[in-house]
Amino acid sequence: KIYKTLLDIPEERLYITPNGVNTEAFRFTELPIFGHHSIYLAKVDYRKRQHLFQSIKTLYFAGNIADDKFDIETNYLGEWSKEYLYENLTEYGNLVLLSDGEAHPLVIMEAFAAGLGVVISEFATANLDVSKEFITVIPENKIHDIKFVEEQIIKNRDFSINNRHAIIDYSRQFDWVNVIQKHYLPAIQKVIS
């Protein structure tokens, strides 16, 4: 919408490619070690809003710190390397990302590739089938209702733990091979012709 309205670029000249992920890079386990924990994996900054949810006891945080309101003494796991992410993301029950403006964050596709369900803000729903039970969308008008958010995280985690193979199947549409074939190459062909 922004490209069409603010920049006045005609729709036939817009070629938007969704994020893709190397699904084969992620280790998968059916029985995660931290299945009763959720992971909020993102740069810790004000826009990502991690500080709002630190009172949720089963929610753990990973990412580099850029928010002085965030208490690093509460469930903070440090910054993860890509290798650590590939190996360990599958060990959590689900992923939480309640930021205020990312449309199609890569970390969501990474969570799917590791077999995790997601709890996301309404801003992060682009290209997702939100009818899937392992995708929980928190409405913006409920984002400060910590009890509600916690209940939704637990509900999603309980469902996701028992439906990991369905999540892995869903993740395949975001695999780089599929994204390149379905979106990137057709866009290049249109530009060339």
PLM regions and their residue ranges:
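Donor nucleotide-sugar binding/catalytic pocket of nucleotide-sugar-dependent glycosyltransferases
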Residues: K1-R27
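Conserved donor-binding/catalytic core segment of Leloir-type glycosyltransferases
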Residues: E30-K48, Q54-K57
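Conserved acidic donor-binding segment of nucleotide-sugar-dependent glycosyltransferases
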Residues: E79, K132-H144, I153-D158
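Short alpha-helical segment that forms part of, or immediately flanks, the ligand-binding pocket
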Residues: Y86, M109-A113, N127-L128
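Short alpha-helical donor nucleotide-sugar binding micro-motif in glycosyltransferases
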Residues: E87-Y92, Y184
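Aromatic "clamp/platform" in nucleotide-sugar-dependent glycosyltransferases that forms part
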Residues: D100
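Short hydrophobic beta-strand element within catalytic cores of glycosyltransferases
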Residues: G117-S121, N127
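A charged, aromatic-enriched C-terminal amphipathic alpha-helix characteristic of glycosyltransferases
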Residues: N141, R157-I192
